[in-house]
Amino acid sequence: MRLWKSMAWGILLWHSQSGALCPAWPPARAAEEITRLQQQLADWNDIYWKQGVSAVDDSVYDQLSARLVQWQRCVGQDVSSTPVSPPLNGTTMHPVAHTGVRKLADRQAVEQWMRGRSELWVQPKVDGVAVTLVYQNGKLTRAISRGNGLQGEDWTPKIRLIPSIPQTTQGALANAVLQGEIFLQREGHIQQRMGGMNARSKAAGMLMRQDNASALNSLGIFIWAWPDGPANMPERLSQLAKAGFSLTKKYSLAVKDASEVERARQSWLTSALPFVTDGVVIRMAKEPASQYWRPGQGDWLAAWKYPPVAQVAQVSAIQFSVGKSGKITVVASLVPVILDDKRVQRVNIGSVKRWEAWDIAPGDQILVSLAGQGIPRLDEVVWRSRERSKPVPPDSHFNSLTCFYASETCQEQFISRLVWLGSRSALGLDGMGEASWRALHQTHRFEHIFSWLALTSAQIANTPGFAKGKSEQIWRQFNLARRQPFTRWIMAMDIPLTQAALQASGDRSWEQLLMRTEQHWRQLPATGERRAGRVIDWRDNPQIKTLSRWLAAQHIPGFGS
């Protein structure tokens, strides 16, 4: 598949500002796009926290929230109003504020953060809903949603119905404030293989709905903070385990460097766990007194998240490619994203009809993942830009019998045919990729797909961009091609037969091929009535006949008299 020459680029140009990619929008459009995305996130957020229903995948919501913040920073807008936390409906104050956790981008950032810090521990970053548990005189008296970190909703009635959360405590925990994650319990969850499964939304939904008390049995608790608890981490973990919060001790490891953090992170990513995770949290055993905890100021802990299985990517352009058979394929160019260490900047949408059904235009946000063999795959459109500037696809008059000869309208299918004939399925011209064919064609103006046979070594050497070694290699490859058997040349001419069928036919010359009837073709392996008819149409095509005579003049095996 080759890129259509008159491909339409979107109006989105990009520049760097403070290390981020910013859309070069006019001020009015920037304000409109930011407002629309902000409102959509707010609507999703409201549904999520009020009704317990997830209208969008957790990962998509998180990535679009980050995209909104990026856009706001690009235009110098205040980001404090971004709806990345639950709407503040509750008025119950947290005894100790939730600080949140700083995100570290990679191992280098982890190493830098760990430098100068001691008594460090790593825990899985459990994907659920944050909560404060308050125990007084040995009894659970209050449970408060995270809210804005300072105050949230009173969840006490629901939390009392969750069997996995201890309702009574003893000793130091008899009067304590705990912070943790309410999560959807899983059996043998392998994060790398199973992904997030919208576990956060499901847990939130169970807590929000009024008619599903039995569903609360499937929720668990992972305590990640005991403000003003024992200074010694092993002692803290031991007391939590004795009180019924056993997961914290089981999944807390002392670490000395980033290598140990990385090993734990990889182990938890690939091992069976009782919960969904989205990374790891590194924390110091020594914490400030709880009176100093403030939202956004927890510098004694940091998170190293897993890369998402799918990334939200912005469409920068829509391109069209025409294959050797004349099929038009639509490709979306993307502002590059990283998926599993792979830089993804293009994704195949499919046919023009499929593109029209997807309704994708430059500026849209799409969800991209990696399919088999690391091929980028379009999963869904998660956000559409207000401006719908779409390119016009090329005419659909191309087919399997067009563009054996070069013309202005045939450029892309013609190049596709050259790439095909140079592939291992045809003549096997090593080192001849699309760029080399384009350079030769643009310089020497091929008349047809075999015009390269008439090039001299001097002409090849004078092709712009060809070094001496490359031009000599191409010259050798072109000469070796002349010795290829007849069947290889027929494949290069794109006969509509498989190699197995062509070998079974026994034809070793053009003269033999001309004598074959449709009945003969129909009897070959994987060749029915329809394909046999296509072979006859191909053989009788005027351009194919002319090419066969030209190959005969070049003394190609099987084409001479």
Curated annotation (Swiss-Prot):
Keywords: DNA damage, DNA repair, DNA replication, Ligase, NAD. Pfam families: DNA_ligase_aden (PF01653), DNA_ligase_OB (PF03120). InterPro entries: DNA_ligase_AS, DNA_ligase_B, DNA_ligase_CS, DNAligase_adenylation, DNAligase_N, NA-bd_OB-fold, NAD_dep_DNA_ligaseB, NAD_DNA_ligase_OB. One of its GO terms (molecular function) is DNA ligase (NAD+) activity. It comes from the Bacteria. Its EC number is 6.5.1.2. It is an enzyme of class 6 (ligase). It catalyses: NAD(+) + (deoxyribonucleotide)n-3'-hydroxyl + 5'-phospho-(deoxyribonucleotide)m = (deoxyribonucleotide)n+m + AMP + beta-nicotinamide D-nucleotide. One of its GO terms (biological process) is DNA repair. Catalyzes the formation of phosphodiester linkages between 5'-phosphoryl and 3'-hydroxyl groups in double-stranded DNA using NAD as a coenzyme and as the energy source for the reaction. This is DNA ligase B. It comes from Salmonella dublin (strain CT_02021853). The gene is ligB.
